[in-house]
């Protein structure tokens, strides 16, 4: 708390900007372009949420590892996610959103396969690291792409994407928990595998139109 106050004490809120949109509805219907971005973000949002809530339980139930090793699962997710988000901007500027997104999706694929089929706790930890890094920047890139669409005001497109993506983020833990209870926790993470493959085919939706 002290460090947060120290680093944020000089921050000032931005001036309120005029909003040209008159849409005050609680639900903003996504356009086809925004819906493509929603599909793209399904896998990173689901896997991020699943890893945060279920990675420790996965390690405990599958490998019966000590609490310290169990906790390392979520540490690996958070550490790689933070690192990728911190350094991603410069790589996006150099290589572009499409190439960075492809690398991210491939990283998620490697991570999910490792977690689903691993017979070693350390390989699973590496898998969680790949999931954290792979899921780090796709949603921020999708939000940026939604804001750059010219068919509607940026605020509407961003809200449309955010409301559905965060709904997935919030619903993922209980749904995956139900799957884990009835079919096994490996299967609950495996649900993300087809979604990762689908995300690969929607990377082109990040292009500005």
Where in this protein do the model-derived segments appear?
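Structural signature of the two symmetry-related core transmembrane helices
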Residues: 99-114, 193
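Paired small-residue
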Residues: 111, 122-130
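Extracytoplasmic gate region of multi-pass secondary transporters
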Residues: 30-75, 79-83
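C-terminal membrane-cytosol helix-exit motif in multi-pass small-molecule transporters
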Residues: 1-18, 202-207
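Juxtamembrane intracellular "pre-TM" segments in multi-pass secondary transporters
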Residues: 9-37
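Intracellular juxtamembrane helix-capping segments at the cytosolic ends
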Residues: 137-150
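A late C-terminal transmembrane helix in Major Facilitator Superfamily
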Residues: 150-185, 189
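Helix-to-loop junctions at the C-terminal end of transmembrane segments
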Residues: 84-97, 180-181
């Amino acid at each position: 708390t002290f460090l947060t106050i120290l680093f944020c004490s000089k921050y000032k809120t931005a001036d309120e900007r005029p909003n040209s949109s008159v849409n005050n509805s609680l639900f903003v219907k996504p356009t086809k372009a925004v819906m493509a971005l929603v599909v793209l973000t399904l896998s990173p949002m689901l896997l991020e949420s699943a890893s945060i809530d279920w990675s420790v339980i996965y390690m405990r139930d599958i490998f019966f590892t000590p609490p310290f090793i169990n906790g390392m699962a979520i540490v690996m997710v958070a550490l790689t996610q933070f690192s990728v988000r911190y350094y991603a901007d410069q790589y996006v500027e150099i290589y572009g959103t499409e190439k960075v997104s492809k690398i991210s999706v491939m990283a998620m694929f490697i991570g999910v396969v490792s977690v689903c089929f691993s017979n070693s706790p350390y390989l699973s930890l590496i898998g969680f690291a790949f999931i954290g890094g792979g899921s780090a920047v796709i949603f921020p890139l999708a939000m940026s792409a939604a804001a750059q669409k010219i068919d509607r005001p940026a605020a509407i497109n961003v809200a449309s994407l955010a409301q559905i993506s965060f709904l997935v983020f919030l619903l993922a833990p209980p749904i995956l928990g139900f799957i884990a209870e009835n079919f096994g926790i490996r299967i609950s993470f495996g649900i993300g595998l087809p979604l990762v493959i689908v995300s690969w085919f929607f990377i082109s939706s990040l292009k500005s139109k």
